[in-house]
């Protein structure tokens, strides 16, 4: 067997990449309107960043990180998520000293050693936002609203917003003990992962997918019942704001998310068409993470979307039609090939997409290839056209065509003509 992409990774070929480009364009437009600014951080970071930021007891840190030593024996890790790197950059570059609230977004590959399955890979891509510097419940409502705007703009129809509060540290400490006390008598009946988590990270047992564990957890104490008055007030304000924005939600007391840094609001968007793996966006508030990583006390909230899962949904839907013509240059003969190359470059400078057939194959095959790649218009320069300085313009959908001087195509009149043939100009 020859060389292949490593297990858990995949190539994104051009036919699929158009869906990624569409997704990225939609996201950029919405994030720009909401005044979020893009940030890019390294693909690998110092390992302690994730150990301290995500939590050593989490599955991500204990089981799933790609960690290695460089030639100077420094421990480095391919980023398993985006928030820790953004927070590190926020601290390192003193963004907090600029005052006000920082609205940031990122997009890029992440890495986790997981069992590959549909929509889940060891190299995967996330779109994420972080709002740093605001404890206001309006920030919680805003990031949820922005996420919903993106998902709805992509055409997702079966969305459900799951909402919970994980409280502050004191709330969780009291609840953690109550949960351990409840689960300990059932330890032998829990799935192996939950047994391991019982004293290390018991809150993660709440989102176990094992049916027997789920049945036990169903009767467990609820974290919502252990919230302080302050935590409860924050959560109630978030709910009130979501209602004011017309955003429906369901309270899910078992929703805790998989990272240790979350406080107060935790949420997920699920798309039911993806079944049990239906989470397409998840996030929450992390009011202590900046301080824990060496920065000043800074409340913050954010979310991340798994793009592979969104692409699974997008590929079942037609993309919006192109509003720009896709021109395909077909030539025969040395003079025509030269003129075709020059004309194509001139048209590209005018803003058109122009594909030049470089195969040297027969005329008919070149025209068939134009149709196969999705071109809207075929530009044909044969030997006679090369002699006359003309070009045949052929609309592939209708088969209509017209002979015009090559330089006429550079006029503004042709911007609309390329999209729709004009009666009176056509020869058949």
UniProtKB/Swiss-Prot annotation:
Subunit relationships: Homodimer.
Protein name in UniProt: Histidine--tRNA ligase
Source organism per entry reads: Thermosynechococcus vestitus (strain NIES-2133 / IAM M-273 / BP-1)
Q: Which InterPro entries match?
A: aa-tRNA-synth_II, aa-tRNA-synth_II/BPL/LPL, Anticodon-bd, Anticodon-bd_dom_sf, His-tRNA-ligase, HisRS-like_core, HisRS/HisZ, HisRS_anticodon
The regions listed as transmembrane in this protein's record are none
Give the similarity note: Belongs to the class-II aminoacyl-tRNA synthetase family.
> Keyword Aminoacyl-tRNA synthetase: yes or no?
yes
| Gene Ontology terms for molecular function | ATP binding; histidine-tRNA ligase activity
- Top-level enzyme category: ligase
Q: Which reaction does it catalyse?
A: tRNA(His) + L-histidine + ATP = L-histidyl-tRNA(His) + AMP + diphosphate + H(+)
Main location per the UniProt record? cytoplasm
Localization in the cell = Cytoplasm
The UniProt keywords, alphabetically, are: Aminoacyl-tRNA synthetase, ATP-binding, Cytoplasm, Ligase, Nucleotide-binding, Protein biosynthesis
Q: What is its EC number?
A: 6.1.1.21
Q: Which NCBIfam families match?
A: hisS
> Which domain of life, per UniProt?
Bacteria
């Amino acid at each position: 067997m020859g060389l292949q992409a490593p297990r858990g990774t995949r190539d994104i070929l051009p036919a699929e990449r158009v869906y990624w480009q569409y997704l990225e364009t939609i996201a950029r437009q919405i994030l720009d309107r909401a005044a979020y600014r893009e940030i890019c951080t390294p693909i690998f970071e110092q390992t302690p960043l994730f150990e301290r930021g995500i939590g050593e007891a989490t599955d991500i840190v204990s089981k799933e990180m790609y960690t290695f030593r460089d030639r100077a024996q420094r421990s480095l890790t391919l980023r398993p998520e985006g928030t820790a790197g953004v927070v590190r950059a926020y601290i390192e570059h003193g963004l907090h000293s600029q005052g006000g609230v920082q609205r940031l977004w990122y997009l890029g590959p992440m890495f986790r050693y997981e069992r590959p399955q549909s929509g889940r890979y060891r190299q995967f891509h996330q779109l994420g936002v972080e709002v740093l510097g605001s404890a206001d419940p309006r920030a919680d409502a805003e990031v949820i609203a922005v996420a919903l705007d993106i998902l709805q703009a992509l055409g997702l129809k079966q969305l459900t917003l799951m909402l919970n509060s994980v409280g502050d540290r004191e709330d969780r400490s009291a609840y953690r003990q109550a949960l351990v006390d409840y689960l300990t008598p059932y330890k032998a009946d829990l799935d192996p992962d939950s047994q391991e988590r019982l004293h290390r990270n018991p809150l993660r047992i709440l989102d176990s997918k094992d049916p027997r564990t789920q049945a036990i957890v169903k009767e467990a104490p609820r974290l919502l019942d252990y919230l302080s008055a302050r935590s409860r007030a924050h959560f109630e304000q978030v709910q009130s704001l979501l209602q004011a924005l017309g955003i429906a939600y369901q309270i899910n007391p078992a929703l805790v998310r998989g990272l240790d840094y979350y406080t107060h609001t935790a949420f997920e968007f699920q798309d039911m068409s993806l079944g049990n793996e239906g989470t397409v966006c998840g996030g929450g508030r992390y009011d202590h993470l900046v301080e824990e990583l060496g920065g000043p006390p800074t409340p913050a909230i954010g979310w991340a979307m798994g793009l592979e899962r969104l692409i699974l949904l997008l590929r079942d839907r037609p993309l919006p039609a192109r509003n720009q013509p896709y021109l395909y240059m077909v030539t025969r003969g040395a003079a025509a090939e030269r003129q075709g190359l020059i004309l194509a470059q001139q048209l590209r400078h005018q803003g058109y997409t122009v594909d030049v057939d470089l195969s040297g194959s027969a005329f008919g095959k070149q025209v068939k290839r134009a149709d196969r790649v999705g071109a809207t218009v075929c530009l044909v320069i044969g030997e006679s056209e090369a002699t006359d300085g003309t070009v045949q313009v052929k609309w592939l959908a209708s088969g209509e065509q017209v002979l015009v001087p090559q330089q006429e195509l550079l006029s503004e009149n042709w911007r609309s003509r390329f999209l729709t043939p004009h009666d009176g100009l056509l020869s058949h």
